């Protein structure tokens, strides 16, 4: 899907080939290797691409965004708020309706006390959010959840399962 990061789409194609070969262990190893690689990538490459609309509808003067705001719109409003609070409007363009953006999950606590940020193409270092990128959740949502649908259908697990015999022998 176009809403999936390109690096994940490519990895899914490779994963399907491994799954079709019929080897659960090789599939699990490939998932682990991709996860390690995924964690080394910059936010720009692993974030969800989206289009942005209705920003004004969800904007709130007192709380940045209204309850029920879609996650990518919430991230865009938080981006604009952060850029303004750091007086970086001259250096970085604010996100507007119609823009193509990316959004990524963050670990909380962080400097904005939110679990998401959106950005147009590149997440500026000055926003001080790179170290808070939630790689585990991002990996789960962008790659693992879609792959698990197929693995569940054929009775496979994404990671090796411990069974009782391993505890006793």
For each feature predicted by the language model, list its residue ranges.
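DNA-dependent DNA polymerase catalytic subunits
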Residues: 1-169
């Amino acid at each position: 899907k176009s809403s999936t990061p390109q690096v994940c789409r490519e990895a899914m194609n490779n994963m399907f080939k491994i799954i079709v070969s019929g080897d659960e262990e090789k599939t699990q190893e490939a998932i682990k290797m991709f996860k390690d690689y995924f964690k080394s990538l910059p936010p720009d490459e692993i974030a969800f691409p989206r289009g942005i609309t209705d920003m004004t509808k969800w904007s709130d003067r007192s709380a940045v965004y209204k309850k029920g705001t879609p996650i990518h719109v919430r991230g865009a409003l938080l981006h604009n708020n952060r850029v303004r609070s750091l007086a970086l409007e001259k250096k970085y363009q604010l996100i507007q309706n119609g823009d193509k953006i990316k959004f990524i999950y963050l670990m909380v606590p962080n400097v904005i006390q939110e679990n998401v940020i959106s950005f147009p193409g590149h997440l500026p270092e000055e926003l001080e959010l790179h170290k808070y990128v939630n790689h585990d959740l991002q990996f789960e949502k962008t790659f693992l959840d879609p792959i698990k649908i197929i693995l569940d259908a054929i009775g496979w697990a994404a990671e090796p399962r411990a069974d009782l015999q391993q505890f006793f022998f």
